[in-house]
UniProtKB/Swiss-Prot annotation:
Name of this chain's protein: 1-(5-phosphoribosyl)-5-[(5-phosphoribosylamino)methylideneamino] imidazole-4-carboxamide isomerase
Coiled-coil annotated residue ranges, if any: none
Gene coding for it: hisA
Top-level enzyme category: isomerase
Lineage, highest ranks first: Bacteria, Pseudomonadati, Pseudomonadota, Betaproteobacteria, Burkholderiales
Gene source species: Cupriavidus pinatubonensis (strain JMP 134 / LMG 1197) (Cupriavidus necator (strain JMP 134))
Family to which the UniProt record says this protein belongs: Belongs to the HisA/HisF family.
EC assignment: 5.3.1.16
Length: 248
C-alpha cells in the first residue's frame, strides 16, 4: 500500500483546502520544495502535486514551485501532478521536465478524445482523477457536478489505457472523516487497473481498512490534511501499511 503525500499549491505556497474551497485555504509552507524534501525524508515513495490555481483556470499556474519540487526530489521518487492539464503540449512539457505521471481530471470528462490521444502518445504516464460526490463526478475544481456515474467513466478510461484512477470523495476531503472505503472498493472491483483512494484519510484505522482491501485493487492513498495537522504521523503510517501488506 503506497501512501502518497499531497502537496497542494496555491499562489506558490503549500496549502490545504477544506472540500476544495479556495477561500478555505490553510498555508502550511511557503517553500514547497522544502516540503517535498521533508516528505521524502519521512519515507515517501511518491508525491502527489496539485496546481490548485491551474485547476480553476485550465492551464498551469504554479510552474516555478512545481519545477523546484522536481529539481529537489524528482530523481529520487516518482512525482505526479494534476491541475490545469488540458492539452498534449502541457503533458509533453511536464514529462520532459521530469514528472513521472500527469493526472487528467476535468479534461477527461469534458473531452474524452483528448484523454484517448494522451494515452496513445504518453502511455504509462497518464492517470485520471475522478472526483465525486454521492457517486456523481464533479469537474472544474469540484465546482460543477455532472450526471456521470464514477464507475461508468472509469471503465471507459480503462479501455483508453490509463495507468490508474485516483478516486476522491469530495464530501470527505479535508474533513478528517475517514476514507469512503466502500465506494473505493466498489470502483476497484469493477476494473483491472489500480485505484488510488483520496479524500478523508484521518488515522491509522483508515490505513488498516485500506490494507484489508489492497487485494481488491486499491493500490495506494493520497495523504492530505491528516499528515499536515499531525493527526497522522506519515512515517508510522507507511511502516504500518508495509507491515500489513507483507502479511505481518
Amino acid at each position: 500500500m503506497l501512501l502518497i503525500p499531497a502537496i497542494d499549491l496555491k499562489d506558490g505556497q503549500c496549502v490545504r483546502l477544506k472540500q476544495g474551497d479556495m477561500d478555505q485555504a490553510t498555508v502550511f509552507s511557503e517553500d514547497p520544495a522544502a516540503m517535498a524534501r521533508h516528505w521524502v525524508n519521512q519515507g515517501a515513495r511518491r508525491l502527489h502535486l496539485v496546481d490548485l490555481n491551474g485547476a480553476f483556470v485550465g492551464k498551469p499556474r504554479n510552474e516555478a514551485a512545481i519545477k523546484a519540487i522536481i529539481a529537489e526530489v524528482g530523481d529520487e521518487i516518482p512525482v505526479q501532478l494534476g491541475g490545469g492539464i488540458r492539452d498534449l503540449n502541457t503533458i509533453e512539457r511536464w514529462l520532459d521536465d521530469g514528472l513521472s505521471y500527469v493526472i487528467i481530471g476535468t479534461a477527461a470528462v469534458k473531452n474524452p478524445g483528448f484523454l484517448k490521444d494522451a494515452c496513445s502518445a504518453f502511455g504509462g504516464h497518464i492517470i485520471v482523477g475522478l472526483d465525486a460526490k454521492d457517486g456523481k463526478v464533479a469537474t472544474d475544481g469540484w465546482s460543477k457536478l455532472t450526471g456521470h456515474e464514477v464507475a461508468d467513466l472509469a471503465r471507459k478510461y480503462e479501455d483508453y489505457g490509463v495507468e490508474a484512477i485516483i478516486y476522491t470523495d469530495i464530501g470527505r476531503d479535508g474533513m478528517l472523516q475517514g476514507i469512503n472505503i466502500d465506494a473505493t472498493v466498489k470502483l476497484a472491483q469493477s476494473m483491472s487497473i489500480p485505484v488510488i483512494a483520496s479524500g478523508g484519510l484521518s488515522n491509522l484505522a483508515d490505513i488498516d481498512n485500506l490494507c484489508a482491501v489492497e487485494n481488491e485493487g486499491v493500490e495506494g492513498v493520497i495523504c492530505g490534511r491528516a499528515i499536515y495537522s499531525g493527526d497522522l504521523n506519515f512515517t508510522d503510517a507507511q511502516a504500518r501499511a508495509d507491515k500489513l501488506s507483507n502479511g505481518e
